[in-house]
């Protein structure tokens, strides 16, 4: 009789035992490559995999690109190490410190491990002012801490609101996407990785949600990415809830 394998215990076990070629290895490389690539990192998938598996650099690459890739691996591990802890300001700031540690910049606005000093924008979206960021993040965390049954609607809503706050000078998208991983794993949901190929669809979905235009595109993107993860879980023979849900059904639940 086969033993049921669940994703979170497998990730924790493979991390602890430094297992090569498993789902932990794949998720680390896929997540770091795509999340960094969306933000302009120029490392190839093979370079990303090489850094993770050998802790060395193959060929020539930007120092900052390498640091951000290695740092993302540490952030992924931090999500696993703190899986029993709720999302908090402290955890969010520590993720940012790990992500941006060692990055070379002469930008006066660069603050590592703490909130932005100056206002910023995301396209045409006006983000939260620096002096209001801490209160906005606390309010967002507090609101979601009272939700008993978290589903993909909640994950998308939290992500869109976090990105609208845009609490840091840089790294907001990567931190936000790492938090979706934490929310999914903590709530027994299949996590997802937004691929670089989905970037424009993903950004359009964020923008539509943030201006209150419509809410389907972002969740559709998350659900599509979740299907890709389910295929990987099938390959590695990891069990998961096979209940199918559509973006429209999630919206109807809120009505």
Annotate each language-model stretch with its function.
Residues 1-255:
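FIC/Doc superfamily catalytic core
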């Amino acid at each position: 009789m086969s033993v049921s394998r669940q994703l979170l215990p497998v990730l924790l076990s493979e991390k602890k035992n430094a297992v090569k070629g498993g789902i932990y290895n794949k998720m680390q490389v896929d997540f770091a490559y795509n999340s960094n690539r969306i933000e302009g990192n120029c490392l190839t998938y093979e370079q990303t995999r090489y850094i993770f598996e050998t802790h060395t650099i193959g060929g020539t690459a930007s120092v900052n690109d390498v640091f951000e890739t290695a740092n993302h691996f540490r952030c992924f591990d931090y999500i696993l190490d703190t899986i029993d802890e709720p999302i908090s300001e402290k955890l969010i700031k520590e993720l940012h410190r790990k992500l941006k540690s060692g990055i070379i910049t002469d930008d006066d606005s660069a603050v590592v491990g703490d909130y932005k000093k100056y206002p910023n924008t995301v396209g045409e979206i006006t983000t939260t002012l620096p002096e209001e960021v801490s209160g906005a993040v606390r309010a967002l965390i507090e609101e979601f801490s009272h939700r008993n049954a978290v589903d993909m609607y909640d994950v998308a809503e939290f992500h869109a609101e976090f990105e609208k706050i845009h609490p840091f000078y840089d790294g907001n998208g990567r931190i936000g996407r790492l938090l979706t991983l934490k929310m999914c794993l903590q709530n027994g949901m299949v996590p997802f990785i937004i691929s670089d190929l989905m970037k424009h669809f993903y950004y359009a979905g964020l923008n539509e949600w943030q201006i209150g235009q419509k809410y389907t595109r972002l969740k559709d993107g998350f659900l599509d990415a979740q299907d890709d993860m389910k295929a990987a879980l099938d390959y590695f023979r990891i069990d998961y809830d096979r209940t199918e849900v559509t973006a429209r059904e999630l919206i109807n639940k809120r009505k």
